[in-house]
From Swiss-Prot:
Protein name per Swiss-Prot or TrEMBL: Probable rhamnogalacturonase B
Active site: 219 (proton donor), 294
Source taxonomy: Eukaryota, Fungi, Dikarya, Ascomycota, Pezizomycotina
Bias (Low complexity): 466-475, 490-499
Annotated source species: Aspergillus oryzae (strain ATCC 42149 / RIB 40) (Yellow koji mold)
Main location: secreted
Amino acid sequence: MRINTLSLFSLVSLVPTLALASLSGSVGPLTSASTKAATKTCNVLDYGAKADKTTDLGPPLASAFADCKSGGLVYVPSGDYALSTWAKLSGGKAWALQIDGTIYRTGTDGGNMIFIEHSSDFELFSSTSSGAMQGLGYEYHKDNKWSGPRLLRLYDVTDFSVHDFILVDAPAFHFSLDTCTNGEVYNMAIRGGNHGGLDGVDVWSTNVWIHDIEVTNKDECVTVKSPSKNILVENIYCNWSGGCGMGSLGKDTDISDITYRNIYTWNSNNMMFIKSNGGSGSATNLLFENFIGHGNAYSFDIDSYWASMSSQGGNGVELSNITLRNWKGTEENGASRGPIKIVCPDGAPCYDITIEDFAMWTEDSSRQRQWYSCRNAYGTGFCLKSGSNHVAYEATTTTVSSAPSGYSAATMAADLKTDFGITASIPIPTIPTSFYPGATPYSALMANKGSTAKVRAVVAPSKPTTVAAATSTPAEQQTSTSTPAPAVEQPSQQSPGQSAGEVGGCPFGNGRSVPTGPPRAGHRHHQRHGHH
């Protein structure tokens, strides 16, 4: 779907409590998948693919892409496919990749199983919300091998979306967004092994909206890396994960205007972890709002001397203009690992940090106390020092023995009771319909055509979307008008090329507005793992 920004005047007049968006402009593909499919549909079955879990999908997928790369839709129908040679799909324009089947890794090369690069106006999706990649990473991990392939990588892709898709058990990372622009990623489930180095979503890009995603692993949940600008991360369910973070940050770090909102973290290493060791550059204008956590080792953690990362030299990465707002819940052991730990570089103290409405408490009934610790950090709240003379200082720690008011927070019914280990096949999950307590996903799953999705208050008025009947053949796609629609989606049949912004996913059409946010003026024992 295409998301369009509104003017600041419109935002302020319609929703006074919201300020300028973290995003800098429109995100998503320029044309719908049905339009692409009507131009041309390239079904991999017509290029030699077989849904027999044995025949290599790689060559048929590459051939189908070659025929549709200049405008069209590449279609992988339902069924089980083997991928033994990786697919590098480069130079596409106005194209879509619809994967309704399950792709199983059968090859052993490194690199990326599906690598999409130098493309524009692109969409990857499953019309059934059940298309998946199964990496079978346990076949590596049970032998303590961690250098296998990644599942999905986008590089230098503009005006794109990835949605209604499932990634399971990567031998290495699951999903990377590398130097991409104007993208939207949503309605996904990512499930990996319980070990470091099996990242969920890594993003170093510009103007990208990531929302409504569940991640299970033991490393990065959704993590921003450098360089990145104008990234909005919302409605994220870190369900037995490593947790969200930024980094590792090193030399010439360039990160700004990042918002994390509505982040639910269960039984993970941390709720938000900003990690570095030396380095240079800066990360500024960061908002971490509406976080709920339970059973996590760390809550908010800035570690500028992270021991799992080799020193990068330099005075350190300068962190500034950071706001934490509305954090609730519990941590595993507040006496050992307090909910606020901020360690900034001696050579580049952090400043303009604001911590407000932060209430968390320990789950350790035998030691009813917790601490807050700050070093070289300036701002307002808890252990932060005030003042404009930002000089280095030794850590100051405050210990409290009574629970703060208002710390109690909701849990999620789907909170996992155990991890998936690293020695057995991990089952393919279904994409959930809830990612944060009380928050409705922005877009209904494509499999739930008649369901309702939440509409932000900021939406351009328009007539309802007109939906034409879909046919059952891949080449004859349905059409729809590209106007914003009311909250209730219109039901329709599923067919190749039917995509968000039409009838299957987002009910808003191409006039949907950007959500807004204030512009800030290892294992069960929680072992940390170093990589990147």
